Amino acid sequence: MVWENDDGRTGRESVIYLDDPETAEQNLLMAQTRPSRLLVGEAPRLIDEWQDAPQLWDVIRYDIDHSHALGKFILTGSAVPPDDKKRKLVKHTGTGRFAWLTMRPMTLFESGESSGGVSLGDLFAGRKALGDSAPNKLEDLAYLACRGGWPVAATMKRGRAALRQAFDYVDAIAEHDISRVDEIRRDASFTRRLLKSLARLQGTQSAVSVIRADLGSNEPNTFSENTVYEYVNALKKIFVLEDMPAWCPNLRCKTPIRTTDTRYFVDPSIATASLGLGPDDLLNDLKTFGYIFETLVARDLRTYAEALNGSVSHYKDKSGLECDAVVHLRNGHYGLVEVKLGGERLIEEGVKTLRRLSGEIDLKRMPSPSFLMVVTAQGEFSYERPEDGVIVCPIGALKP
């Protein structure tokens, strides 16, 4: 299995760190000459930074084929995957031998900042245990969006030091990580400008041409669309960007559906740090806060959905009808979600969108949605509206 290392270490019995400064050179030499030696150890055997020696992939596959053991190895790595040259050292895909897990920054439930009173799994099963209180006020959500779900920051006392972690991460992206992904030196200053532009475009279906135009709105833009595309692709490879795919349901009408992905950072704190914003800035600009909060909800919903063997997409058609998130499971069940900061007017807007989209779905060709839900930032508790059955749930009450 391929896990991010902090989580992988909790499930191992033995470990080897390929990038240990004292043994790194020896480890890489061993990987080239006698790689099976690196696999020796009590199972599960964790191999950290495996991408530095990708030839281990085939050695592990061979071992699994002959031992028929399950859960024998855990491969963990940093955000930087093998480059194209290293990928050529892998001869077999490993289908049927390896399971992949995408590790993201922590959700509010994982960091202990959601009560977990409302289970996404229960909603799909028709169980609506609502009424649970949410621990967070709007000020809390502004802080949590800026702090992000980084494990180190989540364990720190609330304050400037915890908020600083996201800024340090953005610095590392611009100065090092975006160039390390494929050993192509990229401009740190342009990377910062690009991150800032992408932060302004969170939750939109912006094409590369739109991103380039935004980049040139404040200062001369000497980079081509192709260069912008390459930088964006590099950010995806290091798991900074995780765009949300479009949902294409069966509809009764013939309105064309937009199929462009929605732009999101993997964590809202990347957006706030790129823009140089703190919690007070978000509270003073609720429009911007709304986009940042949408990124936070997208992060959490993705993790919650994957725990249920599901995924998250978005909907938008040519008429302008748009749904922020569609959570769908492998069995064909799905739920429609709108994201709002809160307040009666915004909640009503979300309800109107959900009911309109639900009414457009062709129920002869697909099932009706398991639930309609407005996820909010503020709100003391979750509830189901008696007049239409729409669930209103603060993000601080949600769990898988």
Predicted regions: what they are:
Residues 375-400:
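Domain-level recognition of nuclease-like catalytic cores that cleave nucleotide substrates
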Residues 83-204:
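Interdomain motor-coupling "hinge/lid" segment immediately C-terminal to the ATP-binding subdomain
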Residues 13-44:
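Short glycine-rich substrate-engagement loop in P-loop NTPases that contacts/grips substrate
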Residues 17, 334-345:
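Active-site ExK catalytic segment of metal-dependent nucleases
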Residues 158-333:
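Accessory nucleic acid-recognition modules appended to NTPase machines
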Residues 57-81:
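Conserved catalytic/switch belt of AAA+ P-loop NTPases
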Residues 39-56:
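Conserved P-loop NTPase "ATPase switch" module shared by AAA+ and STAND
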Residues 1-13:
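P-loop NTPase Walker A phosphate-binding motif
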